[in-house]
Design a protein with these regions (language model features):
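Conserved N-terminal phosphate-binding loop of PLP-dependent enzymes in the Aspartate aminotransferase
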Residues: 2-405
Length: 405
Protein backbone atom coordinates (compact mmCIF):
# COMPACT_ATOMS: atom_id res chain seq x y z
CA UNK A 1 0.00 0.00 0.00
CA UNK A 2 1.38 3.41 -0.95
CA UNK A 3 2.02 6.06 1.70
CA UNK A 4 0.91 8.71 -0.77
CA UNK A 5 -2.73 7.71 -1.19
CA UNK A 6 -5.44 10.34 -1.00
CA UNK A 7 -7.89 10.47 1.89
CA UNK A 8 -10.63 8.47 0.24
CA UNK A 9 -8.21 5.73 -0.78
CA UNK A 10 -7.09 5.34 2.84
CA UNK A 11 -10.71 5.18 3.97
CA UNK A 12 -11.63 2.64 1.29
CA UNK A 13 -8.66 0.47 2.28
CA UNK A 14 -9.60 0.67 5.95
CA UNK A 15 -13.18 -0.32 5.22
CA UNK A 16 -11.91 -3.42 3.42
CA UNK A 17 -9.34 -4.48 6.02
CA UNK A 18 -10.20 -3.23 9.52
CA UNK A 19 -12.84 -4.97 11.62
CA UNK A 20 -15.92 -2.75 11.64
CA UNK A 21 -16.12 -2.04 15.37
CA UNK A 22 -16.14 1.76 15.02
CA UNK A 23 -18.29 4.19 13.07
CA UNK A 24 -15.45 6.49 12.14
CA UNK A 25 -15.64 10.05 10.84
CA UNK A 26 -14.40 10.54 7.27
CA UNK A 27 -11.13 11.98 8.45
CA UNK A 28 -7.56 10.69 8.17
CA UNK A 29 -5.38 12.34 10.79
CA UNK A 30 -1.73 12.84 9.92
CA UNK A 31 0.12 14.69 12.72
CA UNK A 32 -0.36 16.87 15.77
CA UNK A 33 1.24 19.95 17.25
CA UNK A 34 0.31 21.49 20.58
CA UNK A 35 -3.47 21.30 20.90
CA UNK A 36 -4.14 20.96 17.17
CA UNK A 37 -4.40 17.94 14.88
CA UNK A 38 -3.88 17.99 11.11
CA UNK A 39 -5.38 15.69 8.50
CA UNK A 40 -3.85 14.35 5.30
CA UNK A 41 -5.40 17.26 3.38
CA UNK A 42 -3.61 19.78 5.60
CA UNK A 43 -6.71 20.91 7.52
CA UNK A 44 -6.21 21.94 11.15
CA UNK A 45 -8.50 20.91 14.02
CA UNK A 46 -8.60 22.31 17.54
CA UNK A 47 -8.70 19.18 19.66
CA UNK A 48 -11.04 19.14 22.65
CA UNK A 49 -11.07 15.35 22.88
CA UNK A 50 -7.36 14.53 23.37
CA UNK A 51 -7.80 11.03 21.96
CA UNK A 52 -10.55 10.47 24.58
CA UNK A 53 -8.66 12.04 27.50
CA UNK A 54 -5.32 10.47 26.56
CA UNK A 55 -3.07 13.20 25.15
CA UNK A 56 -2.89 15.35 28.28
CA UNK A 57 0.34 17.02 27.14
CA UNK A 58 -1.05 17.74 23.70
CA UNK A 59 0.95 16.67 20.68
CA UNK A 60 4.71 16.60 19.98
CA UNK A 61 5.79 17.46 23.51
CA UNK A 62 9.57 17.61 23.17
CA UNK A 63 10.50 16.02 26.51
CA UNK A 64 8.08 13.16 25.98
CA UNK A 65 9.32 12.55 22.43
CA UNK A 66 12.99 12.64 23.38
CA UNK A 67 12.47 10.24 26.29
CA UNK A 68 10.75 7.76 23.97
CA UNK A 69 13.42 8.07 21.28
CA UNK A 70 16.18 7.52 23.83
CA UNK A 71 14.51 4.40 25.21
CA UNK A 72 13.90 2.98 21.72
CA UNK A 73 17.64 3.26 21.10
CA UNK A 74 18.42 1.53 24.40
CA UNK A 75 15.93 -1.26 25.26
CA UNK A 76 12.28 -1.87 24.37
CA UNK A 77 11.36 -5.09 26.12
CA UNK A 78 12.70 -7.69 28.52
CA UNK A 79 9.74 -9.53 30.17
CA UNK A 80 8.84 -9.41 33.82
CA UNK A 81 11.24 -12.21 34.71
CA UNK A 82 13.80 -9.44 35.22
CA UNK A 83 13.93 -5.94 36.72
CA UNK A 84 14.26 -2.86 34.54
CA UNK A 85 15.15 0.63 35.70
CA UNK A 86 12.62 2.73 33.70
CA UNK A 87 9.55 0.99 35.10
CA UNK A 88 10.91 1.11 38.66
CA UNK A 89 11.42 4.86 38.29
CA UNK A 90 7.92 5.20 36.82
CA UNK A 91 6.39 3.18 39.65
CA UNK A 92 7.99 5.46 42.22
CA UNK A 93 6.53 8.56 40.56
CA UNK A 94 3.00 7.14 40.26
CA UNK A 95 3.00 5.88 43.84
CA UNK A 96 4.29 9.19 45.20
CA UNK A 97 1.54 11.08 43.36
CA UNK A 98 -1.22 8.70 44.44
CA UNK A 99 0.00 7.85 47.97
CA UNK A 100 -0.75 4.21 47.17
CA UNK A 101 1.71 1.45 48.08
CA UNK A 102 1.91 -1.09 45.25
CA UNK A 103 1.45 -0.93 41.48
CA UNK A 104 1.07 -3.35 38.57
CA UNK A 105 1.49 -1.98 35.05
CA UNK A 106 -0.85 -3.21 32.31
CA UNK A 107 -1.28 -2.43 28.61
CA UNK A 108 -4.65 -0.68 28.86
CA UNK A 109 -7.45 0.52 31.09
CA UNK A 110 -9.61 -2.56 30.70
CA UNK A 111 -6.65 -4.74 31.72
CA UNK A 112 -6.22 -2.56 34.79
CA UNK A 113 -9.86 -3.19 35.70
CA UNK A 114 -9.39 -6.93 35.22
CA UNK A 115 -6.42 -6.84 37.58
CA UNK A 116 -8.32 -4.79 40.15
CA UNK A 117 -11.20 -7.29 40.09
CA UNK A 118 -8.81 -10.21 40.50
CA UNK A 119 -7.05 -8.49 43.40
CA UNK A 120 -10.36 -7.87 45.17
CA UNK A 121 -11.51 -11.44 44.65
CA UNK A 122 -8.20 -12.87 45.87
CA UNK A 123 -8.31 -10.60 48.94
CA UNK A 124 -11.79 -11.90 49.77
CA UNK A 125 -10.72 -15.50 49.13
CA UNK A 126 -7.76 -15.11 51.47
CA UNK A 127 -10.09 -13.69 54.10
CA UNK A 128 -13.00 -16.12 53.94
CA UNK A 129 -12.73 -18.47 50.96
CA UNK A 130 -15.30 -18.30 48.17
CA UNK A 131 -18.00 -16.89 50.44
CA UNK A 132 -17.24 -13.26 49.66
CA UNK A 133 -17.14 -12.93 45.90
CA UNK A 134 -19.81 -10.35 45.01
CA UNK A 135 -19.03 -6.95 43.53
CA UNK A 136 -21.29 -3.91 43.54
CA UNK A 137 -20.96 -1.68 40.47
CA UNK A 138 -22.84 1.41 39.31
CA UNK A 139 -25.61 1.84 36.77
CA UNK A 140 -24.52 3.85 33.70
CA UNK A 141 -20.87 3.12 34.43
CA UNK A 142 -18.21 2.15 31.93
CA UNK A 143 -15.08 0.18 32.85
CA UNK A 144 -14.01 -1.49 29.61
CA UNK A 145 -14.89 -4.14 27.05
CA UNK A 146 -13.09 -7.29 28.21
CA UNK A 147 -15.34 -9.78 29.98
CA UNK A 148 -14.58 -8.87 33.58
CA UNK A 149 -14.67 -5.12 32.92
CA UNK A 150 -17.84 -5.53 30.88
CA UNK A 151 -19.43 -7.45 33.75
CA UNK A 152 -19.11 -4.38 36.01
CA UNK A 153 -20.17 -1.92 33.29
CA UNK A 154 -23.70 -0.75 34.04
CA UNK A 155 -25.06 -0.60 30.51
CA UNK A 156 -27.16 -3.45 29.09
CA UNK A 157 -26.45 -2.28 25.54
CA UNK A 158 -22.80 -3.25 25.92
CA UNK A 159 -23.45 -6.38 27.96
CA UNK A 160 -26.35 -8.24 26.34
CA UNK A 161 -24.60 -9.74 23.28
CA UNK A 162 -21.90 -11.27 25.48
CA UNK A 163 -23.93 -12.82 28.27
CA UNK A 164 -23.54 -14.81 30.43
CA UNK A 165 -20.93 -12.56 31.99
CA UNK A 166 -19.04 -12.86 35.27
CA UNK A 167 -21.48 -13.87 38.03
CA UNK A 168 -21.84 -12.13 41.36
CA UNK A 169 -22.17 -8.54 40.14
CA UNK A 170 -24.93 -6.28 41.47
CA UNK A 171 -25.73 -2.75 40.34
CA UNK A 172 -26.62 0.33 42.36
CA UNK A 173 -27.39 3.92 41.41
CA UNK A 174 -24.44 6.30 41.28
CA UNK A 175 -24.68 9.15 43.80
CA UNK A 176 -27.37 7.27 45.77
CA UNK A 177 -25.86 5.90 48.98
CA UNK A 178 -29.02 4.10 50.06
CA UNK A 179 -29.10 2.27 46.73
CA UNK A 180 -25.57 1.02 47.38
CA UNK A 181 -26.35 0.00 50.95
CA UNK A 182 -29.33 -2.02 49.71
CA UNK A 183 -27.02 -4.21 47.61
CA UNK A 184 -24.52 -5.02 50.37
CA UNK A 185 -24.56 -8.55 51.79
CA UNK A 186 -22.10 -10.67 53.72
CA UNK A 187 -20.88 -11.89 50.31
CA UNK A 188 -19.82 -8.42 49.09
CA UNK A 189 -16.07 -8.15 48.53
CA UNK A 190 -15.80 -4.84 46.64
CA UNK A 191 -17.58 -1.75 45.37
CA UNK A 192 -16.31 -0.36 42.07
CA UNK A 193 -17.07 3.05 40.60
CA UNK A 194 -15.66 5.82 38.47
CA UNK A 195 -14.86 8.89 40.55
CA UNK A 196 -16.39 10.86 37.69
CA UNK A 197 -18.67 8.85 35.42
CA UNK A 198 -17.48 9.44 31.87
CA UNK A 199 -19.33 7.48 29.20
CA UNK A 200 -22.46 7.68 31.35
CA UNK A 201 -22.70 11.45 30.82
CA UNK A 202 -20.00 13.22 32.92
CA UNK A 203 -21.28 12.91 36.47
CA UNK A 204 -18.83 13.68 39.29
CA UNK A 205 -19.36 11.78 42.52
CA UNK A 206 -21.12 13.87 45.14
CA UNK A 207 -19.03 14.43 48.24
CA UNK A 208 -21.54 12.88 50.63
CA UNK A 209 -21.93 9.87 48.33
CA UNK A 210 -18.32 8.89 47.79
CA UNK A 211 -17.38 9.59 51.40
CA UNK A 212 -20.43 7.62 52.52
CA UNK A 213 -19.38 4.67 50.36
CA UNK A 214 -15.89 4.84 51.85
CA UNK A 215 -17.36 4.73 55.37
CA UNK A 216 -19.60 1.81 54.38
CA UNK A 217 -16.60 -0.10 53.04
CA UNK A 218 -14.67 0.53 56.25
CA UNK A 219 -17.60 -0.67 58.35
CA UNK A 220 -18.16 -3.88 56.36
CA UNK A 221 -14.54 -4.70 55.39
CA UNK A 222 -15.37 -4.16 51.72
CA UNK A 223 -12.74 -2.95 49.26
CA UNK A 224 -13.35 0.33 47.43
CA UNK A 225 -12.11 0.28 43.83
CA UNK A 226 -11.98 3.69 42.14
CA UNK A 227 -11.66 3.84 38.36
CA UNK A 228 -9.52 6.86 37.45
CA UNK A 229 -8.83 5.78 33.88
CA UNK A 230 -10.48 8.84 32.30
CA UNK A 231 -10.79 11.29 35.19
CA UNK A 232 -7.32 10.79 36.67
CA UNK A 233 -3.93 12.28 35.81
CA UNK A 234 -4.66 15.90 36.64
CA UNK A 235 -7.88 16.26 34.69
CA UNK A 236 -10.06 17.03 37.72
CA UNK A 237 -7.76 19.70 39.16
CA UNK A 238 -6.02 17.18 41.41
CA UNK A 239 -3.64 14.49 40.25
CA UNK A 240 -6.36 11.91 40.84
CA UNK A 241 -10.03 12.83 41.08
CA UNK A 242 -10.54 11.06 44.42
CA UNK A 243 -8.09 13.55 45.93
CA UNK A 244 -10.87 16.16 45.66
CA UNK A 245 -12.66 14.26 48.45
CA UNK A 246 -11.86 12.98 51.93
CA UNK A 247 -11.39 9.42 50.71
CA UNK A 248 -8.69 7.02 49.62
CA UNK A 249 -9.39 3.86 47.61
CA UNK A 250 -8.15 0.41 48.51
CA UNK A 251 -7.52 -0.22 44.82
CA UNK A 252 -7.44 2.29 41.97
CA UNK A 253 -7.00 2.03 38.23
CA UNK A 254 -5.47 4.47 35.77
CA UNK A 255 -4.53 4.49 32.08
CA UNK A 256 -5.20 6.91 29.19
CA UNK A 257 -3.08 9.99 30.09
CA UNK A 258 -0.68 7.82 32.10
CA UNK A 259 1.36 7.35 28.93
CA UNK A 260 0.00 10.29 26.91
CA UNK A 261 -0.41 8.13 23.81
CA UNK A 262 1.79 5.16 24.69
CA UNK A 263 -0.47 2.19 25.59
CA UNK A 264 -0.16 1.72 29.34
CA UNK A 265 -2.45 1.25 32.30
CA UNK A 266 -2.00 0.32 35.93
CA UNK A 267 -3.81 -0.83 39.01
CA UNK A 268 -2.59 0.31 42.40
CA UNK A 269 -3.41 -0.83 45.91
CA UNK A 270 -2.67 -0.26 49.56
CA UNK A 271 -0.20 -2.50 51.34
CA UNK A 272 -3.07 -4.05 53.31
CA UNK A 273 -4.63 -5.31 50.08
CA UNK A 274 -1.30 -6.31 48.57
CA UNK A 275 -0.45 -8.47 51.58
CA UNK A 276 -3.62 -10.54 51.12
CA UNK A 277 -4.20 -10.56 47.37
CA UNK A 278 -2.10 -11.25 44.32
CA UNK A 279 0.98 -13.42 44.79
CA UNK A 280 3.43 -14.99 42.30
CA UNK A 281 1.43 -17.03 39.80
CA UNK A 282 -1.85 -15.17 40.40
CA UNK A 283 -1.43 -12.54 37.69
CA UNK A 284 0.94 -11.58 34.90
CA UNK A 285 1.52 -9.74 31.65
CA UNK A 286 3.93 -10.08 28.76
CA UNK A 287 4.26 -6.43 27.74
CA UNK A 288 3.03 -4.57 30.81
CA UNK A 289 5.74 -2.61 32.59
CA UNK A 290 8.39 -2.95 29.90
CA UNK A 291 11.23 -0.38 29.67
CA UNK A 292 9.55 1.60 26.88
CA UNK A 293 6.30 2.24 28.73
CA UNK A 294 8.28 2.89 31.91
CA UNK A 295 10.17 5.65 30.12
CA UNK A 296 6.89 7.04 28.76
CA UNK A 297 5.21 7.19 32.17
CA UNK A 298 8.28 8.69 33.78
CA UNK A 299 8.49 11.39 31.12
CA UNK A 300 4.81 12.23 31.57
CA UNK A 301 5.24 12.76 35.30
CA UNK A 302 8.37 14.84 34.70
CA UNK A 303 6.44 17.10 32.33
CA UNK A 304 3.47 17.34 34.67
CA UNK A 305 5.87 18.59 37.33
CA UNK A 306 7.82 20.94 35.05
CA UNK A 307 4.68 22.50 33.59
CA UNK A 308 2.78 22.37 36.90
CA UNK A 309 -0.14 20.81 35.05
CA UNK A 310 -2.41 20.47 38.07
CA UNK A 311 -2.15 24.18 38.88
CA UNK A 312 -2.71 25.01 35.22
CA UNK A 313 -5.91 22.95 35.17
CA UNK A 314 -7.12 24.78 38.27
CA UNK A 315 -6.51 28.07 36.46
CA UNK A 316 -8.08 27.22 33.09
CA UNK A 317 -10.99 25.00 34.19
CA UNK A 318 -13.09 27.77 35.80
CA UNK A 319 -12.80 29.75 32.57
CA UNK A 320 -13.98 26.77 30.53
CA UNK A 321 -16.90 26.28 32.92
CA UNK A 322 -17.83 29.97 32.66
CA UNK A 323 -17.75 29.98 28.86
CA UNK A 324 -19.77 26.75 28.65
CA UNK A 325 -22.33 28.16 31.08
CA UNK A 326 -22.65 31.24 28.87
CA UNK A 327 -23.16 28.99 25.87
CA UNK A 328 -25.87 27.02 27.68
CA UNK A 329 -27.64 30.28 28.50
CA UNK A 330 -27.43 31.39 24.87
CA UNK A 331 -28.71 28.26 23.09
CA UNK A 332 -32.06 26.62 23.84
CA UNK A 333 -30.70 23.29 22.58
CA UNK A 334 -28.21 23.22 25.48
CA UNK A 335 -29.80 22.44 28.82
CA UNK A 336 -27.12 21.81 31.48
CA UNK A 337 -23.39 21.72 32.14
CA UNK A 338 -21.67 19.52 34.69
CA UNK A 339 -18.22 18.18 35.35
CA UNK A 340 -15.01 18.80 37.22
CA UNK A 341 -11.82 20.46 36.03
CA UNK A 342 -11.14 19.81 32.36
CA UNK A 343 -13.68 17.00 32.17
CA UNK A 344 -16.93 18.73 31.28
CA UNK A 345 -20.22 17.67 29.74
CA UNK A 346 -23.08 19.70 28.26
CA UNK A 347 -26.52 18.19 27.66
CA UNK A 348 -27.78 18.86 24.15
CA UNK A 349 -31.20 18.27 22.60
CA UNK A 350 -29.74 18.21 19.09
CA UNK A 351 -28.39 14.84 17.88
CA UNK A 352 -24.94 14.95 19.47
CA UNK A 353 -23.39 12.79 16.76
CA UNK A 354 -24.39 15.39 14.20
CA UNK A 355 -22.96 18.14 16.41
CA UNK A 356 -19.61 16.32 16.49
CA UNK A 357 -19.69 15.85 12.72
CA UNK A 358 -20.51 19.49 11.96
CA UNK A 359 -17.91 20.64 14.49
CA UNK A 360 -15.29 18.85 12.39
CA UNK A 361 -16.41 20.95 9.42
CA UNK A 362 -15.66 23.99 11.59
CA UNK A 363 -12.23 22.69 12.58
CA UNK A 364 -13.16 21.45 16.05
CA UNK A 365 -12.89 17.97 17.54
CA UNK A 366 -15.45 17.37 20.28
CA UNK A 367 -16.88 13.99 21.26
CA UNK A 368 -19.98 12.69 22.98
CA UNK A 369 -20.87 10.88 26.21
CA UNK A 370 -24.04 8.88 26.57
CA UNK A 371 -26.89 9.66 24.20
CA UNK A 372 -27.22 13.42 24.66
CA UNK A 373 -24.04 14.91 26.10
CA UNK A 374 -21.20 16.79 24.42
CA UNK A 375 -17.97 15.83 26.17
CA UNK A 376 -15.04 18.21 26.59
CA UNK A 377 -11.79 16.49 27.60
CA UNK A 378 -9.08 18.62 25.95
CA UNK A 379 -5.33 18.37 26.41
CA UNK A 380 -4.49 19.73 29.84
CA UNK A 381 -2.13 22.29 28.30
CA UNK A 382 -4.93 24.33 26.69
CA UNK A 383 -4.96 28.08 27.30
CA UNK A 384 -7.92 30.41 27.74
CA UNK A 385 -7.46 31.52 24.12
CA UNK A 386 -8.05 27.91 23.06
CA UNK A 387 -11.28 27.89 25.05
CA UNK A 388 -12.37 31.06 23.24
CA UNK A 389 -11.59 29.46 19.87
CA UNK A 390 -13.52 26.33 20.81
CA UNK A 391 -16.57 28.34 21.90
CA UNK A 392 -16.53 30.32 18.65
CA UNK A 393 -16.39 27.16 16.53
CA UNK A 394 -19.05 25.41 18.61
CA UNK A 395 -21.36 28.43 18.38
CA UNK A 396 -21.07 28.35 14.59
CA UNK A 397 -21.80 24.62 14.66
CA UNK A 398 -24.91 25.04 16.79
CA UNK A 399 -26.25 27.89 14.68
CA UNK A 400 -25.89 25.83 11.50
CA UNK A 401 -27.56 22.76 12.99
CA UNK A 402 -30.33 24.72 14.71
CA UNK A 403 -31.35 26.09 11.31
CA UNK A 404 -31.09 22.80 9.42
CA UNK A 405 -32.67 20.33 11.85
Amino acid sequence: MSNNMDKQSYIDEAEKELLHTYNRFSLVLDYGEGVHLYDTDGNAYLDFAAGIAVCALGYSNEHHKEALKAQVDKLLHTSNLYYNAPVIEAADKVLNASKMDRIFFTNSGTEAIEGAIKAAKKYAFTRDGHAGHEIIAMNHSFHGRSIGALSVTGNAHYQEPFEPLMPGVKFADFNDLESVKAQVTDKTCAIIMETIQGEGGIYPAKKEFIEGVRALCDEKDILLILDEIQCGMGRSGEMFAWQNYDVKPDIMTCAKALGCGVPVGAFLMTQRVADKSLAPGDHGTTYGGNPFVGAAVSAVFDEFKRLDIVSHVKEVAPYLEKKLDELVAKFDCLTARRGMGLMQGVECSLPVGKVSAEALNQGLIVITAGSNVLRFVPPLVIEKSDVDEMIEKLETTLVILSKSL
